[in-house]
C-alpha cells in the first residue's frame, strides 16, 4: 500500500467512525502540538534496583524507533537480559550484574564433571526458585512487545532470556535461544518435565531447606553487588546460611555443607539421569533445531530490532550479523555498548521498559494518523 493510499485509508476509517473532515484536521493539529511532550504521558513507575541508571527516551528517539518498526514487514526482535532487569532479574555483565562480585555461573563442563557440583546447583536452584517463580513478573517492555506482536508489527521474537516473561506477557511463538529454567531435561533419556514438579519432589526429599526457601521468597530483593554491604537481610534467610542476593537464573547462595547433603532425584521416566534445567549453560551448545529455527528467522527478516542485549554471545550476534550482511537494517535499544553497534543503523541507549510503551503509542499514532 502506498503512502497516499494509506493516508486515504486512515481518513476513510475516521470518517466511517463519525469523525468529520474538520474534526479529523483538528485532531491532527492537537496531536502535533502534543508530540514534543508526548513521552511524559506514559505513566512513570519506580525503577528496580537491577536496572541500570539511564535517562528517559527523547521524543526524537521514540519516533525514530517507531518509524523503524513501521517500515518493516518481517521484523525480527532479539531480546536479552536488559529486558528482564526491569523485572528485578539481574544480569551478568552490567556494572550491577553478578560478574561485578566475581560470581561465576555453573558451566556445562562443571555440571557434568561431578555429582557434588550437580547437588550444589540444584540446592541453590531449589532455595531461589520460589522467589524467582512467584515474584518475577513481566514489565512494560514485555507488555509492549506482546502488543506489537498482536498488532502485526513483530514477525518473530527470539529471546536469550530463560525466565519466560515474554510468555507471561502474552507473546506467542517465542524462540528461546538459550532454553528455559521452567523445564527440566534428563540427559540420559531426553525426557522433559516441569520445573514446578521438580520443586515439589525436591521439597519432599529436602524438607530441611523448605524454611530457607520460604524465607528467601519473602526477603527484599538485593543485588549481587550488595553482597558485602551491611544492608538488612531476612533474619530467617541469614540463619539458614542463605544469601538474599538475587541471581540471574533464579538461584541463591547457600552454605556448602547444606549443598553437599542435598538430595537430587533420578529421572521419573527412566530412573537414571542426571537431571538438568533445560538451559544452555556457559560452555554448552545451542541445540541444532533451535539453531536452525533462529537461522531461518534471521534469513527471513527484513529488519532486526535488538532489545536489552549486548549480543556478546555468538549464538545471538551471528543472527544480527548475517541479517545485516543481507542488507537488513538493524536497530538497537539497550543501555550500554553492544557487539552489534557497528552494524546498527539506529542506536538508542535507553531502558526498554521506559521506552517501548512510548514506541508502541507512537506506532499506533502513525498507523492511525500517518505520523
Feature-to-residue mapping (PLM):
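Conserved catalytic core of sirtuin-type NAD+-dependent deacylases
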Residues: 2-371
Amino acid at each position: 500500500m502506498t503512502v497516499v493510499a494509506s493516508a486515504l485509508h486512515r481518513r476513510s476509517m475516521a470518517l466511517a467512525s463519525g469523525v468529520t473532515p474538520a474534526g479529523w484536521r483538528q485532531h491532527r493539529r492537537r496531536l502535533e502540538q502534543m508530540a514534543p511532550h508526548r513521552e511524559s504521558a506514559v505513566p512513570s513507575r519506580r525503577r528496580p534496583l537491577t536496572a541500570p541508571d539511564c535517562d528517559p527516551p527523547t521524543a526524537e528517539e521514540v519516533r525514530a524507533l517507531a518509524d523503524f518498526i513501521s517500515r518493516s514487514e518481517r521484523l525480527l526482535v532479539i531480546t536479552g537480559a536488559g529486558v528482564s532487569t526491569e523485572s528485578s532479574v539481574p544480569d551478568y555483565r552490567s556494572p550491577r550484574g553478578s560478574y561485578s562480585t566475581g560470581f561465576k555461573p555453573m558451566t556445562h563442563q562443571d555440571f557434568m564433571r561431578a555429582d557434588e557440583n550437580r547437588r550444589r546447583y540444584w540446592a541453590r536452584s531449589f532455595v531461589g526458585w520460589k522467589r524467582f517463580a512467584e515474584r518475577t513478573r513481566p514489565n512494560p517492555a514485555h507488555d509492549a512487545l506482546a502488543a506489537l506482536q498482536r498488532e502485526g508489527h513483530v514477525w518473530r521474537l527470539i529471546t536469550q532470556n530463560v525466565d519466560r516473561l515474554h510468555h507471561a506477557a502474552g507473546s506467542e511463538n517465542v524462540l528461546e535461544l538459550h532454553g528455559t529454567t521452567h523445564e527440566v531435561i534428563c540427559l540420559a533419556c531426553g525426557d522433559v518435565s516441569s520445573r514446578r514438579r521438580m520443586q515439589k519432589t525436591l521439597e519432599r526429599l529436602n524438607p530441611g531447606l523448605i524454611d530457607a526457601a520460604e524465607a528467601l521468597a519473602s526477603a527484599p530483593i538485593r543485588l549481587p553487588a550488595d553482597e558485602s554491604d551491611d544492608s538488612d537481610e531476612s533474619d530467617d534467610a541469614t540463619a539458614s546460611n542463605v544469601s538474599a542476593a538475587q541471581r540471574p537464573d533464579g538461584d541463591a547462595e547457600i552454605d556448602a555443607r547444606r549443598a553437599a547433603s542435598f538430595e537430587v532425584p533420578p529421572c521419573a521416566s527412566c530412573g537414571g539421569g542426571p537431571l538438568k534445567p533445560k538451559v544452555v549453560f556457559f560452555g554448552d551448545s545451542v541445540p541444532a533445531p533451535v539453531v536452525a529455527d533462529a537461522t531461518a528467522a534471521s534469513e527471513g527478516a527484513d529488519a532486526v530490532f535488538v532489545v536489552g542485549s549486548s549480543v556478546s554471545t555468538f549464538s545471538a550476534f551471528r543472527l544480527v550479523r548475517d541479517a545485516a550482511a543481507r542488507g537488513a537494517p538493524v536497530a538497537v535499544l539497550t543501555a550500554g555498548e553492544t557487539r552489534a553497534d557497528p552494524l546498527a543503523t539506529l542506536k538508542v541507549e535507553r531502558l526498554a521498559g521506559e521506552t517501548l510503551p512510548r514506541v508502541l503509542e507512537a506506532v499506533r499514532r502513525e498507523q492511525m494518523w500517518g505520523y
